[in-house]
């Protein structure tokens, strides 16, 4: 909540916002110049707000660097559009233990999802694991209000072989790449923001043989199927929704994958 505007009971509102009864102390809490007029606090907040819009390849370091620049000041991060990690090797959002903020509030808006990236499908190999959505290194100082969803990336589908047939697994949701294949009637497909990819399908009379399907969010990829007549590899493991230390859950909301 911000301090009320003009006209309004700024003094009372400033006390409620900052917990400080001396106005010079309240001014410092909301980062306005001292000495100064009480009206300079109108609309100010003890917390600093930051919003993140939609991105299919979000770089976690962008947020980390901004949070660190605020020092010990509490911050409120609002996710306003779907965001997907740029790689399965890193979480979409990361709150490392080096952050010194009094607390970090994370608000995920309704209809919005924070995604780990989907794993790539295997090419005559196992599927890759999906990525994690959020890593928490600051414990209960991270306060999550999840009005939308938090989703680990789906695992990539497993590949395999049977004679000259090389099977590719489907990509995990979202955006896992499909594995390459040969002698197929249809190749493996990539995962999208809304669906996992499909495994490749054998040519001709071998159409019952398939690469593993990519995993949906929070789910492992499927195993290649050669009906026991070739080499079959497993799909990749599911990414996790929230890893690290348990946060303060103001609202858990919809979760795909494991969480702390």
Swiss-Prot record:
- Which residue spans adopt a coiled-coil conformation according to this UniProt entry? none
Transmembrane intervals: none
Q: A GO CC term? A: virus tail, fiber
- Motif GRM 10 located where? 228-240
Q: Where is this motif: GRM 5?
A: 176-182
Q: Where is this motif: GRM 8?
A: 210-216
Residue span of motif GRM 4 = 162-173
Q: List the disulfide bonds.
A: none
Query: Where do the segments described as Disordered lie?
Result: 176-197
In chain numbering, motif GRM 1 lies across: 116-123
Q: Low complexity: which segments have biased composition? A: 180-191
Q: Does the keyword ATP-binding apply?
A: no
Motif GRM 7, residue numbers:
194-204
**Where is this protein chiefly located?**
virion
The family assignment reads: Belongs to the receptor-recognizing protein gp38 family.
**Extra information:** This phage use outer membrane protein ompA as a receptor.
The name this protein goes by in its record = Receptor-recognizing protein gp38
Native species: Enterobacteria phage K3
The gene is: 38
